[in-house]
């Protein structure tokens, strides 16, 4: 039995071994995508309810919420594809995005404030 290592290299030379990406990483990306889509569907349902049963102000608010829901869907799709390609390329990360959810929260807050202001004025 030899005591020599299986792979021998010259000193200072690195061996490139393939790194296996765990399937749970891909599933986590899909789970996050579905969570964003679930939020967008709830927001779209709210806008459809306002559109069907609301007055003129409700229809304006429904339009705003529809725009936010469509923006959320677009954001979710873009981030999903970006993360999936980074995972396939075995990128070192980071895979989080702090700007997108912050912008979506402020846009949603603006839509809610617009709804309240229109209700108070008219």
From Swiss-Prot:
MF term (GO), any: GTPase regulator activity
GO biological process, one term: energy reserve metabolic process
Transmembrane portions of the chain: 33-53, 60-80, 102-122
Positions on the Cytoplasmic side per record topology: 1-32, 81-101
The entry's keywords: Cell cycle, Chaperone, Membrane, Transmembrane, Transmembrane helix, Vacuole
Loss of function: phenotype: Defects in endocytosis.
One Pfam family per UniProt: DUF202
Vacuolar compartment segments: 54-59
Cellular localisation: Vacuole membrane
Chief location category: membrane
Highest taxon of the lineage: Eukaryota
Gene Ontology CC: one annotated term: cell division site
Topological relation to the membrane, as annotated: Multi-pass membrane protein
Subunit structure: The VTC core complex is an integral membrane heterooligomer composed of at least the catalytic subunit vtc4 and the accessory subunits vtc1 and vtc2. vtc1 is a small membrane protein without hydrophilic domain. Vtc2 and vtc4 are related and have 2 hydrophilic domains that face the cytosol, an N-terminal SPX domain and the central core domain. The central core in vtc4 is the catalytic domain. Vtc1 interacts with GTP-bound Ras-like cdc42, which is subsequently inactivated.
Free-text function comment from the UniProt entry: Accessory subunit of the vacuolar transporter chaperone (VTC) complex. The VTC complex acts as a vacuolar polyphosphate polymerase that catalyzes the synthesis of inorganic polyphosphate (polyP) via transfer of phosphate from ATP to a growing polyP chain, releasing ADP. VTC exposes its catalytic domain vtc4 to the cytosol, where the growing polyP chain winds through a tunnel-shaped pocket, integrating cytoplasmic polymer synthesis with polyP membrane translocation.
Homology family: Belongs to the VTC1 family.
The name this protein goes by in its record: Vacuolar transporter chaperone complex subunit 1
């Amino acid at each position: 039995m030899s005591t020599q290592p299986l792979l021998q290299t010259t000193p200072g030379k690195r061996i490139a071994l393939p790194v296996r990406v765990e399937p749970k990483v891909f599933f986590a990306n899909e789970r996050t995508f579905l969570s964003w889509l679930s939020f967008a569907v709830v927001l779209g349902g709210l806008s459809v309810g306002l559109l069907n049963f609301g007055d003129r102000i409700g229809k304006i608010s429904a339009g705003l919420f529809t725009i936010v829901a469509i923006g959320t869907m677009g954001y979710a799709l873009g981030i999903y594809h970006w993360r999936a390609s980074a995972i396939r390329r075995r990128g070192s990360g980071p895979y989080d995005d702090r700007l997108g959810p912050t912008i979506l929260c402020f846009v949603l807050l603006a839509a809610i404030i617009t709804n309240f202001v229109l209700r108070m004025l008219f």
